[in-house]
UniProtKB/Swiss-Prot annotation:
Recorded superkingdom: Bacteria
SUPFAM superfamilies hit by this protein: GIY-YIG endonuclease
PROSITE patterns: GIY_YIG (PS50164)
Domain GIY-YIG span(s) in chain numbering: 8-83
Family: Belongs to the UPF0213 family.
Protein name: UPF0213 protein ECA0725
Pfam families: GIY-YIG
């Protein structure tokens, strides 16, 4: 991993499959990653799942912080993830970044 990639701006994103499943990931470019997933060149978990919809994304800081946030989101229940999608809390990522900077 290059120094630039490690410290660039990373985003957390959530996609919904046609079956209603939610997928959480991180990337430096949400549009590019969406296109990769749609083309079947993204995560194996999404291959063959049909049309994907971006339902949430937010800035997550550097790669390390993005990975930590992704892990925390993946530990949530389906109903908790649905609440995130419904509420669209941009503060989720901001609060996580602030806690990291002050801690």
């Amino acid at each position: 991993m290059t120094e630039h990639a490690e410290h660039s701006r990373w985003y957390l994103y959530m996609l919904r499959t046609v079956a209603g499943a939610l997928y959480t990931g991180i990337t430096t470019d949400v549009s590019r990653r969406m296109n990769q997933h749609q083309a079947g060149k993204g995560a194996k978990a999404l291959r063959g799942k049909g049309e994907l919809t971006l339902v949430f994304h937010c800035l997550a800081g550097d790669r390390s912080n993005a990975l930590k946030l992704e892990y925390r989101i993946k530990q949530l229940s389906k109903s908790q993830k649905e609440r995130l999608v419904q509420d669209q809390p941009q503060a989720l990522c901001i609060d996580t970044l602030s806690a990291r900077e002050s801690g």
